[in-house]
Amino acid sequence: MTNTKGKRRGTRYMFSRPFRKHGVVPLATYMRIYKKGDIVDIKGMGTVQKGMPHKCYHGKTGRVYNVTQHAVGIIVNKQVKGKILAKRINVRIEHIKHSKSRDSFLKRVKENDQKKKEAKEKGTWVQLNGQPAPPREAHFVRTNGKEPELLEPIPYEFMA
């Protein structure tokens, strides 16, 4: 048999609810506030069929460009053959959540601002760029009275 062409084909596990998370959608889902410019993750929720994104957008991250009473408009990148298109989709709020991908960046910006402020008060220069981890400091290895053992590879022998 050939594959069917349904819009929910192959989503048996994708849109299923997690173990012991079936039933009524928690109210916290509806209490979240979305504004233009927010970065959100798209994850289809099988409990609510209305306003569900197509399976190709499941797991994607996009930016909110429009907010209505029940849904939000999101700009998402979608690869079609060789090109990446910025698609605009409308999704109900049950199927999205705020992305944590930007949290580490915002935290770093806040820390850098704090460092800049302190350096300005002291009148010193501060390094803000992320630096690779330096080599470890020199240290002695304790052998507890045992002699170190020399390891060397076994020479290769051709067996025919």
UniProtKB/Swiss-Prot annotation:
Keyword Coiled coil: no
GO cellular component terms given for this protein: cytoplasm; cytosolic large ribosomal subunit; cytosolic ribosome; endoplasmic reticulum; ribosome; synapse
Keywords annotated in UniProt: Cytoplasm, Endoplasmic reticulum, Ribonucleoprotein, Ribosomal protein
Biased composition (Basic and acidic residues): 112-123, 136-146
Superkingdom in the source lineage: Eukaryota
Family: Belongs to the eukaryotic ribosomal protein eL21 family.
Record's protein name: Large ribosomal subunit protein eL21
Gene this chain is encoded by: Rpl21
